[in-house]
Every structure is written in C-alpha cells, then in structure tokens.
Amino acid sequence: MILVIGHAMAKPETLHAMLAISVEHVLRSRTEPGCISHEVSADVQQPLRLSFVERWSDLAALKAHFRVEASRAFAKALAGMADGMPQNSVYQSEEIDLAAGRG
C-alpha cells in the first residue's frame, strides 16, 4: 500500500477557499481506481494547517492520480493560496494486524 501524508498552511483569508477546494479534491479522488482512502482535516492546535492522508493500492494508482488534470489543477490552486509551499511525503507501507499476536 502507498501512503501519502501532506500538509498546507492557509492564510486567514484563504482558509475557507482552501478547505472548499480540498474537500472537492478529496471527494473526486476517492472515486479513482486504487484509492483506498483520501482525507483532509484541520489541525486542532493549528487551525490554519490542513493535513492530508491518502492510502493507495499501489504506486501505479498514485501516479495515475497525479496525472489527472483536476489533481494537477488542485495542487496548483492550493499552492497559490497557501502560506508557503504545501508538503507531501510518500511511503510504501503495509498494515500490521496487532490482534494477530495476541492469544
């Protein structure tokens, strides 16, 4: 599984617009092949910080997501409104079943 963790800092005057385009992006992305989950949330300690967490079935699905014109337009629009550059980190991961070791 591929895990994407990112964040973007809003300015007070851009927070509402950044949230709106982020929710639209999340809802669209969830319909793409290979998307397991895609979420955006506001940090409770830093309300201007938007956090993104995405889970993709494989790297090919994530690369296809990055090639979607709407994804590219979202990234450009978000960067244009953000206070600084949005950050993204991509990881290859596997889920660990913590209950499997009990017994």
Write out the residue ranges for each language-model feature.
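Short, surface-exposed ligand-recognition loops at beta-strand->loop->(often short) alpha-helix junctions
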Residues: 10-16
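Active-site-flanking beta-strand signature of metal-NTP-handling nucleotidyl enzymes
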Residues: 2-8
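Glycine-rich beta-strand-turn "strand-cap" elements at beta-sheet edges
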Residues: 40-46, 76-103
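N-proximal accessory regions
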Residues: 1-2, 17-19, 56-58
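An amphipathic, aromatic/His-enriched active-site/gating alpha helix that lines ligand/cofactor pockets
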Residues: 28-36, 55-89
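Hydrophobic packing within well-folded, soluble alpha/beta domains
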Residues: 6, 18, 38, 50-52, ...
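Short, glycine- and small/hydrophobic-rich beta-strand elements in well-ordered beta-sheets
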Residues: 26-51
